[in-house]
């Protein structure tokens, strides 16, 4: 039996080395790859956990990945862009002494975001209808702004503005700013809905801990984190629109919670 096995193995190797054998091997390799790709993309459509809040939290990871990375890339590019001319609405004047251009968006962050959103859409439970719509809008606005950033970045990197006296820059500006602003609106809306969903989860978890353990160490830890997150979120708001009295009240609540 051993000699027969060696003989069969030899024949298989000889076949694999032939032209026909190579074709068959390639077909098997491609078939295996296709099967692996299909398995990798087969995210579950049902809840990701038997615990409702845990299932929701896991589902939200997709959109959160986008705002943590892709959004930051677009925001960074916009900030750089509007930093070197006096009026963001009017755009480049042609009189600027220094032209910085704008930062490109790293493709991997965009690709990862889109992959995460694709996985998010496959998970139907728990239902998140409002978030679904906002995520669709977010992705559409991301797809709209990224190519415009890329085109503008290439123009500035090549220093074409030195040849045309920023003529193309002035032409590009309205469309670029419109795309930036629309993406920013979509990003804010997505963040607000995520904040609402996460806040509800935190409130339910706090109530659950209070019921089972009382207002002890774990409850205080959760409560402190909740208040701290609210402080950070309010602190990130536009200073001109910040409710100073409400922020002061929140800070006092945080201090009291830390001392509890």
Please place each PLM-identified region on the residue numbering.
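Bacterial signal peptide processing site
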Residues: 23-26
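Leu/Val/Ala/Ile-rich N-terminal alpha-helices, chiefly Sec-type signal peptides and the beginnings
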Residues: 36, 40-181
């Amino acid at each position: 039996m051993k000699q027969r096995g060696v003989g069969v193995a030899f024949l298989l190797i000889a076949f694999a080395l032939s032209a026909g054998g190579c074709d068959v091997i390639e077909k098997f390799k491609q078939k295996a790859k296709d099967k692996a790709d299909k398995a990798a993309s087969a995210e579950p459509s049902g809840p990701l956990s038997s615990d409702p809040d845990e299932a929701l939290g896991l589902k939200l990871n997709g959109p959160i990945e986008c705002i943590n990375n892709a959004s930051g890339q677009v925001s960074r590019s916009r900030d750089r862009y509007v930093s070197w001319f006096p009026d963001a609405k009017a755009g480049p004047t042609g009189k600027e002494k220094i032209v910085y251009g704008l930062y490109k968006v790293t493709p991997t962050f965009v690709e990862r975001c889109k992959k995460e959103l694709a996985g998010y859409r496959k998970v139907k439970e728990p239902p998140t209808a409002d978030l679904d719509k906002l995520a669709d809008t977010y992705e559409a606005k991301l797809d709209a702004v990224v190519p415009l950033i890329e085109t503008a970045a290439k123009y500035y990197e090549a220093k074409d503005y030195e040849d045309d006296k920023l003529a193309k820059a002035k032409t590009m500006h309205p469309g670029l700013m419109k795309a930036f602003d629309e993406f920013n609106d979509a990003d804010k809306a997505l963040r607000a809905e995520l904040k609402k969903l996460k806040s509800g989860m935190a409130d339910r978890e706090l109530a659950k801990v209070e019921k089972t353990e009382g207002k002890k160490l774990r409850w205080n830890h959760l409560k402190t984190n909740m208040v701290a997150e609210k402080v950070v979120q309010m602190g990130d708001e536009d200073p001109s629109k910040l409710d100073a009295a409400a922020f002061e009240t929140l800070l006092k609540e945080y201090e009291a919670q830390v001392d509890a």
